[in-house]
A protein has these predicted regions:
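Exposed, low-structure sequence patches enriched in small/polar residues
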Residues: 1-302
Length: 302
């Protein structure tokens, strides 16, 4: 047994840790990265390019109800990605573009081997076989301006492709209680967003009529896993994490889950959101007016 310090004032001063009823999860995350970079510079433009390789070891140690288990020991995930960075700066323009890849460590809540019953109608539990995500990210930002007319444009673009995307397997039991467990998607997750704004564009020589416009949009494509048959709930009074994972997941590669043997099927969701607006401004010596219009469109496909 061990000892701990209570997080609250209690006259009874509980100081003995009950090993059987206590749970423990440790994520020993090790990432080794190697990069090969080259740089080119000419006047106001800088270009960096190359490639990177990552070796990621994600070892998870868990202990619950007196049973301990280690996953991922000695196993490495290899990630490869090109690298690109471009910047250009001048009196009229500033442009930056970047492409790189990176992995992300798992949070403890994703691998905890005990159910979270803080909400009795929505019960979640961790997955000790979960693997870290690896994302390839591209960003582009651009700003242009005209010092004579004061017209300008500002834009931004982001595209993200996530391998081993962490999503959730969801199901409801016969009493309407919802359960979910994090899993790695077999299909990559895609996200993109863009935005732009034009401003102070003169429509006549006197610059009394000025035009402006703005636009933005988002796109996402990902999957989740839903039950295809009625699945019984989890017996919380006699819960055993190892037995649960043998039914839900199968072997370390998740053979039962991904084959659909445990009752789950992949569902794909696409979401698109677009919005934009225009405005017209009149600026006279004694009178100023402004007219604007905006619209938004959302689309979801399952």
């Amino acid at each position: 047994s061990g000892s701990f310090v209570p997080g609250f004032s209690d006259k009874r001063e509980y100081t003995v840790l009950a090993e059987y009823w206590s749970s423990l999860s440790e994520n020993r995350y090790f990432r080794n990265t190697a990069q090969l970079l080259a740089q080119y510079r000419k006047e106001q433009t800088t270009v960096q390019f190359g490639a990177s390789a990552e070796a990621v070891n994600n070892e998870i140690y868990t202990k619950s109800y007196g049973i301990s288990r280690t996953t991922g020991k000695g196993e490495y995930l290899w990630n490869y990605s090109p690298f690109l960075y471009i910047s250009h700066s001048s009196e009229k323009a500033f442009i930056v573009a970047r492409y790189n890849g990176t992995s992300k460590a798992l949070s403890n809540s994703l691998i905890t081997p005990v159910p979270d019953i803080s909400n009795p109608t929505f019960i979640s539990m961790g997955n000790i076989y979960l693997e870290p995500e690896f994302s390839n990210n591209f960003t582009l930002s651009a700003n242009f301006n005209n010092k004579k007319t004061f017209a300008y444009f500002s834009g931004y673009l982001m595209v993200d492709n996530v391998n081993r995307n962490i999503v959730y397997a969801n199901w409801f039991d016969e009493e309407g209680v919802q359960y979910n467990v994090p899993v790695n998607s077999k299909k990559a997750g895609n996200r993109a967003s863009f935005s732009g704004q034009f401003g102070s564009i003169p429509l006549n020589e006197k610059k009394s009529f000025l035009f402006g416009a703005s636009f933005s949009g988002t796109y996402s494509r990902g999957c989740s896993y839903q039950n295809i048959n009625r699945i019984k709930g989890v017996d919380m009074d006699n819960f055993n994490y190892s037995s649960f994972m043998e039914w839900f997941w199968g072997n370390s590669a998740g053979d039962r889950f991904y084959s659909g043997e445990s009752g789950f099927k992949e569902s794909l969701t696409k979401r698109i959101s677009l919005s934009g607006g225009v405005n017209l401004r009149y600026k006279g010596e004694r009178f100023t007016s402004r007219v604007s219009f905006s619209a938004t469109r959302d689309m979801v496909e399952y």
